[in-house]
């Protein structure tokens, strides 16, 4: 039994497959730190952000859908997957030099978040590139294959590590003052990921005026 199948069955022990396939609703966000919501004109102005949405993973043998919460900054990433009933099935906390994964009631650690997630869950998810793609930005290893009528990337390919990732930007939206993707589809071989971003909030450092109490 492969890792994805074993992990999928673990999730299904919390909730039936039929209810996992179509997910909605909200989740409680973690407490705020020293970052505060800001408005930006372009996503590259946001050095940190948080999002809520949905993630679907599909292979020839298995498929999984979950609610996604992701809080990203240059120093730290916090990623959580939950069922539609709010049950947490995976949490990943990562810094540039360390990663901690809690999954199926167990804890795992590694120096690299992407390697750790693939080793434990079997998911080959491009965590290093996703922050750019989620915000509609192009990395140095990406080749844009087509653009839409507004010059937004429509399809790109990243072949830094074969097999290549092919990314399709299916729709766009305005969030926090910036245009970002609403739906994306990523394919690499027989692995398919679908992302839907329902809420995206740009974050910045809170500032305290002179004479103002913190």
Curated annotation (Swiss-Prot):
Its main location: membrane. It is a lipid-anchor. Keywords: Cell outer membrane, Chaperone, Lipoprotein, Membrane, Palmitate, Protein transport, Signal, Transport. GO terms for biological process: lipoprotein localization to outer membrane; protein transport. Disulfide bonds: none annotated. A lipid is attached at residue 26 (S-diacylglycerol cysteine). It holds the Pfam family LolB. Gene3D superfamilies: Lipoprotein localisation LolA/LolB/LppX. A lipid is attached at residue 26 (N-palmitoyl cysteine). It comes from the Bacteria. It is found in: Cell outer membrane. One of its GO terms (cellular component) is cell outer membrane. CDD domains: LolB. InterPro entries: LolA/LolB/LppX (IPR029046), OM_lipoprot_LolB (IPR004565). The keyword Lipoprotein applies. Residues 1-25 form the signal peptide. Belongs to the LolB family. Monomer. Plays a critical role in the incorporation of lipoproteins in the outer membrane after they are released by the LolA protein. HAMAP family: LolB. This is Outer-membrane lipoprotein LolB. It comes from Shewanella sp. (strain W3-18-1). The gene is lolB.
């Amino acid at each position: 039994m492969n890792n994805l199948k074993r992990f999928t069955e673990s999730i299904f022990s919390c909730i039936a497959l039929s209810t996992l396939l179509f997910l909605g609703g909200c989740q409680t966000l973690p407490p705020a730190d020293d970052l505060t919501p800001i408005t930006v004109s372009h996503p590259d102005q946001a050095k940190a952000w948080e999002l809520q949405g949905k993630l679907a993973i599909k292979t020839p043998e298995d498929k999984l859908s979950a609610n996604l919460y992701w809080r990203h900054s240059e120093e730290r990433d916090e990623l959580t997957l939950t069922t539609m009933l709010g049950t947490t099935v995976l949490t990943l906390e990562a810094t540039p030099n360390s990663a901690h994964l809690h999954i199926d009631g167990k804890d795992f650690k590694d120096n690299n978040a992407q390697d750790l997630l693939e080793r434990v869950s079997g998911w080959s998810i491009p965590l290093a590139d996703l922050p750019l793609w989620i915000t509609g930005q192009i990395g140095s290893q990406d080749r844009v294959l087509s653009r839409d009528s507004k010059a937004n990337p429509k399809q790109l390919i990243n072949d830094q590590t074969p097999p290549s990732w092919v990314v399709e930007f299916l729709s766009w939206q305005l969030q926090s003052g910036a245009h970002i993707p609403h739906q994306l589809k990523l394919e690499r071989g027989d692995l398919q990921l679908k992302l839907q971003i329902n809420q995206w909030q740009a974050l910045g450092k809170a500032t305290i005026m002179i004479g103002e109490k913190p």
